[in-house]
Amino acid sequence: MAAGCALLALPVRKRPGAMLEMLNRAEAADRYRLALGHAHPDWGNGSLGSVAMSLPRSAEPFLNDPDYVDCMLTVFAALKTRNDRRVALTRLRN
């Protein structure tokens, strides 16, 4: 939900890139956490939520807000795409 609210605070045209940047920051923060044993100072513990909480966010609207639904669909699509790529890479390696 925090990622959707972070996207909602941005102009529509910036949302896809911002979503990818949040995912990249979460992965970087997770690597930092694993290497150093503590959370990244800016991006948190490696979760998407901790990255999103570090950004300006709109207040969470009701789920019948079409703009918020679009933001959540952007979040889910990015997560699904990233997962699908990981599954495909795993299959190629086996």
Task: Give short role names for the model-derived ranges.
Residues C5-A9, A29, D42, A77, ...:
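Compositionally biased non-globular segments, especially hydrophobic aliphatic-rich helices
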Residues L8-G17, R31-A35, A59-P66:
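Charged, low-complexity interaction regions
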Residues M53-N94:
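Amphipathic alpha-helical binding modules
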Residues L36, H40-P61:
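Charged/polar low-complexity intrinsically disordered segments, enriched in acidic residues
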Residues V12, L23-L34, S47, K80:
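Short alpha-helix boundary/capping elements
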Residues M1, E21-L23, A35, H40, ...:
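Acidic, Ser/Pro/Thr-rich low-complexity regulatory regions
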